[in-house]
Amino acid sequence: MTQANSPHLLLVGNDQKVTWNDGRIRFLAPGHDSLSIFDAGADPARPEPVATLALPNSLFGPPVNLAVAPDQRLGLIADSMAWPARDDGAGWQPAPGRDLYVIDLAARPPAIAQRLEVGLQPSGLSINRAGTLALVANKAGRSVSVLRIAGGRVEVCGEVDVGTPVVAVSFAADGRRAFVVKTDTHRLGVLRIDESNAAPRVTHDPAEDLTTGLVPFNLVVSPDGALALVVDMGSPTASDGHADSVSVIDLTATPPRVIDRVMVEDGPEGIAISPDGRYAAVAIVQGSNNPPDEWFHHPRGQIVLLRIDGLRVTRAGAIEVGALPEGVAFSPDSRYLYVGNFLDAEMQVLAVGDEGLSDTGTRIPLPGRPAS
């Protein structure tokens, strides 16, 4: 889930191929995924639907596989998994894919403009603030794809080998660095970016890696560029019943460094920082997709609100939401938070204030289960 500037487009990627039955994962037939496009500008308390596109999407990976360019003329969405039939004919067997779609958001209605191939299993992606470059973290490819954006078109112009599975990436505020999540090695890699020549140059030196908490899965950089927050999932299976953390990274220091860890409940995945930089929200799975007889199962997920004061990050409250919350995004005015509840196939709207989070009661039905 991601939002952009005025008219404040909000993208929601829906995956209808994956579901759970009594806590057991099931793989369903492809062909029913979609991308929902909303405008959160006119009424942030209840975003208005703009369009729904038939488009493949995947729950596999962090819920940051889509992004909107700063000028809002295009969007990117990565589909991390191909979906072939099993050899024995008994259903479907997901496998790493390579597809990335470019959406023309200026068209009426919005439309698919390009289909590109990037590295294997494209997961999290990010567009720089100048709108000239995008990076895609490829989990199975152990690489980061580099995409040039110009004239409403996107071109794959490179791939950086990082030597280990990576699942999420985010640009620094100045666009000269980016940070990539190395989930298997519990590290955050630093990418150096040079756009001074015709072809952008992106490099990676493992010696600059930072150690995060266990199983980092997602990250976000603050609007002022001073800090990054890394979701430490704690277990490759997300929920395992144990408390997890969010690593706080000082990006103003040389070199950048972890300065704190804030404890959160079991199974953090989605994360977003408000446009005004005052708050961050973390989606907590809390075993809501696990079998009911598991000791750590909860029927609902949770959102934890974090308060940001300079480089200091503290808990500011929590609230229960629907089952298996994935993507989260703030409204342009920072007063509302949108939560994609996967198993409920809905977008829930929370109010954000000095007293924390409150439920507005608004539930927006979606044409599928929101994976991002």
Report residues per predicted region.
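Predominantly soluble domains enriched in secretory-pathway, periplasmic, or organellar proteins
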Residues: M1-S372
